[in-house]
């Protein structure tokens, strides 16, 4: 018997470009297995597909090795943050306070 096949998308936004791949996988495939089947690692060898954070439609997946993909899912590969948002806000506030003090 032939397993039903579903179509999903795999997306990654690198610093310099974005890639969206539409692939077909067997129904019941896990998120991690679908990601590996996409072949995106050949285009971005710096990606560690085993441990990189993943999401579907903006929602982080806690266990991509257990979560099954569904028809039409968009698997998103997340990059690490370049700067801690809290630290950036703190620096911005300090800079604004310094500018305000100079103007008084």
From Swiss-Prot:
Pfam families: Ub-RnfH. It comes from the Bacteria. InterPro entries: Mopterin_synth/thiamin_S_b, RnfH, RnfH_sf. Disulfide bonds: none annotated. HAMAP family: UPF0125_RnfH (MF_00460). Belongs to the UPF0125 (RnfH) family. PANTHER family: UPF0125 PROTEIN RATB (PTHR37483:SF1). This is Protein RnfH. The lineage of its organism: Bacteria, Pseudomonadati, Pseudomonadota, Gammaproteobacteria, Pseudomonadales.
